[in-house]
A protein has these predicted regions:
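Helicase motor core with emphasis on the C-terminal RecA-like subdomain
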Residues: 3-335, 339
Length: 339
């Protein structure tokens, strides 16, 4: 949008540094091509522009670097040569699989995985075993409890979330509860699956109302903000979510991640596992919850790939002309061009 302004050159010609975070989410699709074209335009205005790409889940780092900084501008200084910097921090990653009591009776088809609901409930309970009941009048701003032990409740629950947090046939639990143990993220692959699991957890444990939440892209910003504040403050026991919490989150209270169904790739598995133990020296942990028997095989393959350090490569699309046309229109709007 900024590049489409008629005065784009005036405002952006002096940009010195561009940081592209989570480059793995862009490099393999047309959004990544748009980023490449935008960076090329900025480099044309300022040949000394520095570009940094950041990623923790790419199997083909040299290719990803060459895609982000493909060629040097004609007037670029020698020190602008692309450089690959890799961290040497050993990050412990623990992968477990939640198995049914009788594997031979496990379903061969399905995508919800609700047959493992009792085991999931036990896992969440074990991760956050202590709850302290608070009076609603104690609610403050969602900040973490003070070091001296005074407790704070989460920020006021938005009206929409208060309705969805009420289990069928029952009222929402009175008061706010402060989760003293670690929080759990339950990742699903679709919004409908997330909503079904959220409702199933409330039906199984009505007393958890107000301490578990739902997070996906169709919810309002107010609701998502409340959930994220509760995670940061450590006031939520569990959050059922989609890819809306894959990136850009740093919730230290999260100690456990459950993946309902297939993660659809080793890179995404690593990304979601990293939501737990999100600090140097801490162990990231993820538990795979298969929805049918074939996913048991996939879980075993994912564990083996992680043990061998293998992550999928991501390749940029070849000659997406529609993106080029869109970029040319952007240039035309942003001050015009000379064919």
């Amino acid at each position: 949008l900024l590049l489409a302004r008629a005065d784009a050159h005036e405002h952006l010609a002096h940009v010195q540094l561009v940081v592209v975070d989570e480059w793995h989410e862009l490099v393999g699709n047309k959004r990544g091509v748009q980023v490449q074209l935008a960076l090329a335009r900025l480099s044309g205005w300022n040949p000394r522009l520095q570009v940094w790409g950041m990623s923790a889940t790419l199997g083909n780092l040299p290719e990803a670097l060459a895609t982000l900084v493909p060629t040097l501008p004609p007037r670029a200084p020698r020190r602008a040569k692309p450089l690959l910097v890799q961290g040497r921090i050993d990050k412990a990653l623990q992968v477990q699989v939640l198995l049914p009591e009788r594997v031979e009776r496990f379903a061969w088809a399905g995508h919800m995985g609700l047959s493992l609901l009792p085991q999931v409930v036990q896992s969440i309970e074990a991760n956050a075993s202590t709850l302290v009941l608070q009076h609603p009048s104690d609610a403050e701003d969602g900040t973490p409890p003070p070091a001296h032990g005074a407790r704070r409740s989460p920020p006021p629950i938005p009206q929409v979330l208060a309705r969805t947090a009420t289990p069928r046939g029952g009222a929402m639990a009175s008061g706010n509860r402060h989760a003293r143990g670690g929080a759990t993220l339950l990742f699903t692959n679709t919004r409908s699956q997330a909503e079904r699991w959220y409702q199933a957890l409330l039906e199984a444990r009505p007393d958890w109302a107000g301490t578990i939440a739902l997070h996906h892209g169709s919810l309002s910003g107010e609701v998502r903000g409340w959930v994220e504040a509760g995670l940061k403050a450590g006031t939520l026991k569990a959050v059922v979510c989609t890819s809306s919490l894959d990136l850009g989150v740093d919730f230290l209270p999260v100690e456990q991640v459950l993946q309902i169904g297939s993660a659809k790739g080793v890179a995404r598995l690593v990304q979601r596992a990293g939501r737990s133990g999100h600090a140097p020296g801490r162990t990231s942990s993820i538990t795979l919850v298969p929805t049918h028997s074939l996913e048991l095989v996939e879980a075993a393959a994912a564990r083996q790939a992680l043990a061998e350090g293998r992550i999928e490569d991501r390749h940029t699309p070849r000659a997406p002309l529609d993106v080029l046309v869109q970029h040319l229109v952007t240039i035309a709007l942003g001050g015009g061009l000379v064919p």
